Amino acid sequence: LVYFNSDTLRVEDTAGILRDTTQVFRDYSAWYHFVITLDTPNATANDRIKVYVNGSQITSFSVLTNPTQNQSLSWNNNVNHNIGTYASGTYHFGGYMTEVNFIDGQALTPSSFGEYNADTGVWQPKRYAGSYGTNGFYLNFSNNSNTTAATLGADYSGNGNNWTPNN
């Protein structure tokens, strides 16, 4: 679960809060590119969860809890997953999402999803070109003709892992 809490970015699991950034995100008109990697087999505890914003790794957290090595988290497990809200229906995302990539079985860096513009130095997204893995998905929200799993929630990774939009 990734959401905003008092203008900070929070990464949480059923085990509790894992990361809460000290950086705040108060510019509601700004565009942000977030990459969260989970790699619980990693021998370095602080590298098991990484948070990147606009291509730069965030290293300052008010809460930093590491999963144990090889710990199975609720992400990518047989539990209900939500995008844009907490499982209880709270913490609704008050913004726009242009796309969501979920890569199963790899802990990738932001360079897989974006790059700095050579002329402006501004971080910009790029289309992911690799494998999504068995449970991976790519939501680009391009078909907004209806709010169904075959339209707005359609998975464009080729895996058919469609989502059912819900208000």
Where does each model-flagged region fall?
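Short, surface-exposed beta-strand/loop "edge" segments at domain boundaries and coil↔beta transitions
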Residues: 15-20, 89-92, 146-148
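Short surface loop/edge beta-strand patches of beta-sandwich-type extracellular domains
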Residues: 18-26, 86-89, 124-129
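Extracellular glycan-interaction surfaces
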Residues: 2-70
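Extracellular glycan-interaction patches encoded by glycine-rich segments
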Residues: 72-97
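Extended recognition patches within non-cytosolic domains
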Residues: 43-45, 50, 58-65, 96-167
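Extracellular/periplasmic catalytic domains that process cell-envelope and extracellular macromolecules
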Residues: 3-4, 27, 74-77, 130-133
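Generic preference for hydrophobic/aromatic residues in regular secondary structure cores
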Residues: 1-2, 9, 16-21, 60, ...
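Beta-strand-rich, repetitive solenoid scaffolds
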Residues: 1-5, 10-13, 37, 51-52, ...
